[in-house]
From Swiss-Prot:
This is Enolase. Substrate binds at H159, E168, E297, D322, S374, H375, R376, S377, K398. PROSITE patterns: ENOLASE. SUPFAM superfamilies: Enolase C-terminal domain-like (SSF51604), Enolase N-terminal domain-like (SSF54826). SMART domains: Enolase_C (SM01192), Enolase_N (SM01193). Its main location: cytoplasm. It comes from Aspergillus oryzae (strain ATCC 42149 / RIB 40).
Amino acid sequence: MPITKIHARSVYDSRGNPTVEVDVVTETGLHRAIVPSGASTGQHEAHELRDGDKTHWGGKGVLKAVENVNKTIAPAVIEENLDVKDQSKVDEFLKKLDGSANKSNLGANAILGVSLAIAKAGAAEKGVPLYAHISDLAGTKKPYVLPVPFQNVLNGGSHAGGRLAFQEFMIVPSAAPSFSEALRQGAEVYQKLKTLAKKKYGQSAGNVGDEGGVAPDIQTAEEALDLITEAIEQAGYTGKMKIAMDVASSEFYKADVKKYDLDFKNPDSDSSKWLTYEQLADLYKTLASKYPIVSIEDPFAEDDWEAWSYFYKTSDFQIVGDDLTVTNPLRIKKAIETKACNALLLKVNQIGTLTESIQAAKDSYADNWGVMVSHRSGETEDVTIADIAVGLRSGQIKTGAPARSERLAKLNQILRIEEELGNNAIYAGEKFRTSVNL
């Protein structure tokens, strides 16, 4: 069934920045995808094309990327008469059309929009939901696995004010019996946390960050973890709710001295207090002994390979690579070879096509890694990643707090999928790291 039209436009993400939306039209109708974007981006990511014209949107316009879809990609794809069900052929064609290693000619944001919209057209042509189409493309077994929602309830780092260095603190309702129960538990803890934050830090502490988490004026990780632990207790889930962190430590790594500055938001930070990677690793272990931490993302800087390997050898929780791996097959291969981490953070816009995202997950599974499908801080109402998490049996999804519609859109989509699948799906629960084998 041929594609009759491909059209891109500039729309807005959840931060009010422009992003690319792509419509693909076939006989089954109109299929639409919107591309997200990140705030703290890894330097090894596929190239997000921005206009750079400071007089419009502060240089963040995407009119070039939109034009690349409408003038270059659309006519070429339509002329090629590609089968929308054959995603790997579609994505291979898009990569060749761009011709660069990191999609910098046409823009990863242009290519991804087309890739995802065509995937939706492929699912429609097969008459199946998107998650089922993705499951076919990835060759995952059944039953479907519904992911544990890692909910980012408290923000620090580059996502917030205050001196708190670590970027995200997440609650992990892995002991819940189902996805819908997990979401309820998460929402209840989140409401308690908001109330507590306002009580302890003043009314403005209830204000939410880019991903829906609260961002009180917190100074240390212990202070943040104590607040979350208290919220879990008040909601009645002590012992049933775990915690995860995204440290995003590349943001406070001092490469010239190979140290980590936990006071990086202070211009007068005392360099004698900066930590070596061994000291930072000890801090993580101390925190994990005091709090129910099951997962740490980006504990070290993206090119501090030695630190990652050291930590991997000496700890037993999930170590997630995001800035380290940037969903890039070469970086994932290196991380596997150097034993740097044991889980991949999968962000489709870091690599730029659905096929490469699926391959990144499969490469990770092959080495017994976990895979966590992730949103970006600049999100939209597009819910594709919910279907990707279910289709890949990843068992874990990170898509913000149970607040702000662009975050809830994904979680609500998984609720619908749970309802639709009924007994044909299982909740990953405590086995989120190995759910692909369930």
